[in-house]
Amino acid sequence: MDLSIPNPVADTTKAADAGTAGGQPLEIDALIVGAGPVGLFQVFELGLLEIKAHVIDSLKVVGGQCVELYPDKPIYDIPAVPSCTGQELTDNLLKQIEPFGPTFHLGQEVAVVERRDDGRFFVETSLGTRFITKTIFIAAGVGSFQPRTLKVDGIDKFDGKQLFYRVKDPSRFHGRNLVIVGGGDSALDWTLDLVGKAESVVMIHRRDGFRAAPASVAKMKELCEQMEMQFLVGQIGGYEEKDGVLTEIKVTGADGVTRRLPVDDVLVFFGLSPKLGPIAEWGLDLERKQIKVDTEKFQTNIPGIFAVGDINTYPGKKKLILSGFHEAALAAFGAAPYIFPEKKIHMQYTTTSPKLHKVLGVESPVFD
C-alpha cells in the first residue's frame, strides 16, 4: 500500500468527517489518538474484544513517526520479524487490522475533551469532527513533534525549497551540492546514503564528536580520507543568495575563520522537539511531558482514558514498539468493562477460538 496516497484510509476519513463536522456527534465505543504502530495495534487488540475503534492523527498519513521520519530505515526488534522498514511495519499492521474496519480521521488534532454526566466523553477535533465515546486511548508517541531548526536569520524562507529537516524523496538530492548539518544518527545515515549520488557532500557539526553509531562515524571519516566528501567542525552563521536562490552558506570553524561553501541544498538534523499540544490541557497527570499510567490497565488518572506507547510513563518504562504492543493488549482488556459493563470477558486465543476466527474472517482449523 502506498501511504502517500492512502486510498482506503482516505475514503473512511472523508465519509466519517463529512457526516459529523457541524452535525450530530458520532457515538462510538473507542477513540484512539495516534495512528502510529502502537495506535494501529490498539485497533487490533480492541477488535479481538469486538470493540470497533475510530482513529485520529494530526498527520495526513497513517504510520506516525515510523512513516514520517524513517520509512526506509530497518527496524530489527519486532518479534518474529528479523528486519522491516517503518513503512513495511505500517503496511503489515494495516493489513492485520483490516477485519475490524477502523475509521480514520487524519490531518486533525483533538481540540476538546469533556466528561459528560453519563460518564462518556465528548470529543471535538480541530476540523470540527465530534464524538461521544466511552473510552479514549492516547497513542500519540511523543505528541506532535517538530524538528529543531537552524538558527540563522532569514534562512527560513528557503524551508522546503533548499532547506530541509526531513528526507522524504532521497532522489531529489541526487546530483546536487549538499551541506548536511548535525551529529546524530540521522545526519550520518543520510550523509552515507547520499555520498556518490549527490554532486558533493559536506558534513558540518559543531564539534568533532558524534551521537551516532561508531561504525557510521568510521565510515564517514573513511570517505573523507578518500576525498569522497568533506567534514568541517563549525557552525553556520550566515548565507548568500542570488535572485531569491540560496547559493552559499557561511561556516565559522573552531579556529574562528569563516568559510563560504557553495550549496544547492542544506539538510539539517538537529533532532526533534516533542510537544504534547492540546493533550497537555486535558487534566491528565503528567511527568516530564509524559502521561502517568498504572501498569495493570495502562489507565491514566482519568477513568476511561488510557495511554500506550512512547507517550506514557511508569516505573521501568522502556520506549520500544514491543512495549507499546504489550501495553495496547492490557489497555484493551482494561477498557472492556466500560464498553460492556454486564459482560464477563473470557481470555481466548487466536490459535483455538472459533469466535476469534469468525471475528478475524478466517477458517477454524480442523485437527484429527
From Swiss-Prot:
Keyword Zinc listed: no
Cofactor annotation comment: Binds 1 FAD per subunit.
Catalysis: reaction(s): 2 reduced [2Fe-2S]-[ferredoxin] + NADP(+) + H(+) = 2 oxidized [2Fe-2S]-[ferredoxin] + NADPH
Names of the cofactor(s): FAD
Matches recorded under Pfam families: Pyr_redox_2
EC identifiers of the protein: 1.18.1.2
Keyword set, alphabetical order: FAD, Flavoprotein, NADP, Oxidoreductase
Residues given in the record as FAD binding sites: 57, 65, 70, 110, 145, 310, 351
Top enzyme class: oxidoreductase
Gene Ontology molecular functions: ferredoxin-NADP+ reductase activity; flavin adenine dinucleotide binding; NADP binding
PANTHER family hit by this protein: THIOREDOXIN REDUCTASE 1-RELATED-RELATED (PTHR48105)
Family: Belongs to the ferredoxin--NADP reductase type 2 family.
Subunit structure: Homodimer.
Protein name: Ferredoxin--NADP reductase 2
Species: Cupriavidus pinatubonensis (strain JMP 134 / LMG 1197) (Cupriavidus necator (strain JMP 134))
Taxonomy of the source species: Bacteria, Pseudomonadati, Pseudomonadota, Betaproteobacteria, Burkholderiales
